[in-house]
Amino acid sequence: MELLTQLLQALWAQDFETLANPSMIGMLYFVLFVILFLENGLLPAAFLPGDSLLVLVGVLIAKGAMGYPQTILLLTVAASLGCWVSYIQGRWLGNTRTVQNWLSHLPAHYHQRAHHLFHKHGLSALLIGRFIAFVRTLLPTIAGLSGLNNARFQFFNWMSGLLWVLILTTLGYMLGKTPVFLKYEDQLMSCLMLLPVVLLVFGLAGSLVVLWKKKYGNRG
């Protein structure tokens, strides 16, 4: 817990030298792995801010706090394994009360968007859906519910995971190298670190509102 606190303090202070410390960077990789795994894999964790975190990671790479190839590899594994768990939820646990309950608590428009993408584009929808919050968690579950072959799913799963991580991280890296960013580095870094927190709060609040409506809406 102390190491996690030090990590957050180093991030907020933009202390890239401390972040590059082996024990600190190990904790950072662990936290990022868990967040991306959960966001891609478990429906109740779909509100986690994966997109903005990847952009922040790209900036940290630009500042020398993290290595580019190992970060891309590790986070691709996290996203793809999480997506596989989501697929398994649909394939083997889709009819269980727990998974059906999770599905019912996601906003209806995300269900509609995910179903539309999957039925219109098939497996290639995974490539598109990776870049849409909530949908990237829901699509693999729908693929599993449809009885889709695991081997075909895995090909698109790992390809889309790599593209998602690579594109957003590279965007963050390029942002961190721009003259505008270098000029306003302190302010922009603070915004980039606050953005995932703000999105997390809004996502969690939205999920709680949906849960509340499901529980009490029918009583009115």
Swiss-Prot record:
Compartments where found: Cell inner membrane
Keyword entries, A-Z: Cell inner membrane, Cell membrane, Membrane, Transmembrane, Transmembrane helix
Transmembrane helix as UniProt keyword: yes
Cytoplasmic membrane side: 49-52, 95-154, 213-220
Coiled-coil residue spans: none
Impact when changing E39 to A/Q: Abolishes the ability to restore growth, cell division or drug resistance in double mutant
One cellular-component annotation, GO: plasma membrane
Membrane-spanning intervals of the chain: 28-48, 53-73, 74-94, 155-175, 192-212
Pfam family, one: VTT_dom
GO MF annotations in UniProt: transmembrane transporter activity
Major localisation: membrane
Induction: Regulated by the CpxA/CpxR two-component system.
Domain of life: Bacteria
Periplasmic topological domain residue ranges: 1-27, 176-191
Protein family according to the UniProt entry: Belongs to the DedA family.
PANTHER family per UniProt: INNER MEMBRANE PROTEIN DEDA-RELATED, INNER MEMBRANE PROTEIN YQJA
The protein's role, per its UniProt record: May be a membrane transporter required for proton motive force (PMF)-dependent drug efflux. Required, with YghB, for the proper export of certain periplasmic amidases and, possibly, other Tat substrates. May play a role in determining membrane lipid composition.
Protein name in the entry: Inner membrane protein YqjA
Originating species: Escherichia coli (strain K12)
